[in-house]
């Protein structure tokens, strides 16, 4: 389950982490919860710019330095800044950032990891043993056989679509499913969340997804 006191949202600058620090008994409890939350998809944060949005009056300078150190060492982030949640309404990314989409014209081979905060379109196959972590949608013009995590950070409106949808594991937000064994799709399919489960439907060009 996702801790609602720590929200992770992608935007065009990087990743926002919104922490309701008043819900934790102390800094140590918050830090432990944050590390646990981010460890779900650790490689997603490598090389990312992070913005920590929280009530800064509850974090002293020594604690902020320690927090940064943990993020740099454990998650290999590129940069980390702080924003006081009480100063102004934070510009949090909600839903899918439709204007930011990355196109990859290649096969993603086993052992490769792809991280992106927006949507990603892959023109080629995603082989078994590969991993994809994105903040928005995943669309594959080929076979998707690796691990795919769309809506990373809790975006339950994200979708995963492929010409041949047969992933080792598929995750949207915090929900996870697997492909049925020995079931090769006969048509393009779309996976999305409906209610509290991931459903897979045939792709219909004229149907809104």
UniProtKB/Swiss-Prot annotation:
GO BP: cell morphogenesis; division septum assembly; regulation of cell septum assembly
Q: Which Pfam families match?
A: MinC_C, MinC_N_1
InterPro entries in UniProt? CAP/MinC_C, MinC, MinC_C_sf, MinC_N_1, Septum_form_inhib_MinC_C
SUPFAM superfamilies according to UniProt: Cell-division inhibitor MinC, C-terminal domain
Sorted alphabetically, the keyword list is:
Cell cycle, Cell division, Septation
The organism's superkingdom is given as Bacteria
> What does this protein do, in the record's words?
Cell division inhibitor that blocks the formation of polar Z ring septums. Rapidly oscillates between the poles of the cell to destabilize FtsZ filaments that have formed before they mature into polar Z rings. Prevents FtsZ polymerization.
Family per record = Belongs to the MinC family.
**Subunit notes for this chain?**
Interacts with MinD and FtsZ.
What this protein is called in its record is Probable septum site-determining protein MinC
């Amino acid at each position: 389950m996702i801790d609602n006191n720590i929200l992770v949202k992608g935007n065009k600058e990087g990743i926002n982490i919104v922490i309701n620090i008043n819900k934790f008994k102390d800094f140590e409890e918050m830090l432990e919860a944050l590390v646990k939350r981010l460890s779900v998809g650790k490689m997603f944060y490598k090389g990312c710019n992070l913005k920590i949005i929280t009530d800064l009056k509850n974090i002293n300078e020594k604690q902020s330095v320690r927090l940064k150190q943990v993020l740099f060492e454990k998650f290999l982030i590129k940069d980390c800044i702080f924003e006081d949640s009480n100063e102004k309404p934070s510009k949090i990314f909600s839903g899918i950032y439709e204007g930011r989409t990355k196109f990859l014209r290649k096969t993603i081979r086993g052992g490769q990891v792809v991280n992106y905060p927006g949507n990603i379109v892959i023109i080629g196959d995603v082989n078994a043993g590969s991993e994809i972590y994105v903040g928005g949608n995943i669309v594959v013009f080929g076979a998707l056989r690796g691990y795919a995590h769309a809506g990373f950070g809790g975006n339950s409106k994200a979708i995963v679509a492929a010409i041949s949808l047969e992933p080792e594991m598929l995750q949207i937000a915090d929900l996870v499913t697997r492909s049925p064994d020995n079931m090769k799709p006969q048509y393009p399919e779309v996976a999305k969340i409906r209610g509290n489960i991931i459903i897979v439907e045939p792709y219909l060009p004229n149907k809104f997804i």
